[in-house]
Amino acid sequence: MKKLLLTVIQIALLFIFARLINWVTAALHINIPGSIIGIVILFTLLHFKIIKLEWIELGAAWLLGELLLFFIPSAVGVIEYGDIMSKFGVSILLVVVISTFVVMVSTGTLTQLIAKRKEKKQTCSSES
């Protein structure tokens, strides 16, 4: 029960952070999406240990686990544009497949690098 409550709180904090960054981006008329700026800021805060990973880890893990659910509204919205899909469907599909492949390869490579680095760090600290 405590873990569930902590997860919900962390998701709420991530949501508030995202809304705040989107608001700031809109208020300052920045042409970069708030989500991109938010990721960079969150990464920077985590890197410099201003925010501890434990403060957002459970919520972020749940959001990543349920990521597919967040794409359903977008997929349903595509149905409304059947004429565009019939005209450019193959091109759109090609872009989606290639970009998905690039993201998967990049994510897998980065995850392996991080895991190796973490393992190396744990090995060095256990030897000391």
From Swiss-Prot:
<dbReference type="GO" id="GO:0019835">
    <property type="term" value="P:cytolysis"/>
</dbReference>
<dbReference type="GO" id="GO:0012501">
    <property type="term" value="P:programmed cell death"/>
</dbReference>
<protein>
    <recommendedName>
        <fullName>Holin-like protein CidA</fullName>
    </recommendedName>
</protein>
<dbReference type="InterPro" id="IPR005538">
    <property type="entry name" value="LrgA/CidA"/>
</dbReference>
<keyword id="KW-1133">Transmembrane helix</keyword>
<keyword id="KW-1003">Cell membrane</keyword>
<feature type="transmembrane region" description="Helical">
    <location>
        <begin position="59"/>
        <end position="79"/>
    </location>
</feature>
<dbReference type="GO" id="GO:0005886">
    <property type="term" value="C:plasma membrane"/>
</dbReference>
<comment type="similarity">
    <text>Belongs to the CidA/LrgA family. CidA subfamily.</text>
</comment>
<dbReference type="InterPro" id="IPR023760">
    <property type="entry name" value="Holin-like_CidA"/>
</dbReference>
<dbReference type="Pfam" id="PF03788">
    <property type="entry name" value="LrgA"/>
</dbReference>
<feature type="transmembrane region" description="Helical">
    <location>
        <begin position="4"/>
        <end position="24"/>
    </location>
</feature>
<keyword id="KW-0472">Membrane</keyword>
<feature type="transmembrane region" description="Helical">
    <location>
        <begin position="88"/>
        <end position="108"/>
    </location>
</feature>
<keyword id="KW-0812">Transmembrane</keyword>
<feature type="transmembrane region" description="Helical">
    <location>
        <begin position="27"/>
        <end position="46"/>
    </location>
</feature>
<comment type="function">
    <text>Increases the activity of extracellular murein hydrolases possibly by mediating their export via hole formation. Inhibited by the antiholin-like proteins LrgAB. In an unstressed cell, the LrgAB products probably inhibit the function of the CidA protein. When a cell is stressed by the addition of antibiotics or by other factors in the environment, CidA possibly oligomerizes within the bacterial cell membrane, creating lesions that disrupt the proton motive force, which in turn results in loss of cell viability.</text>
</comment>
<dbReference type="GO" id="GO:0031640">
    <property type="term" value="P:killing of cells of another organism"/>
</dbReference>
<keyword id="KW-0204">Cytolysis</keyword>
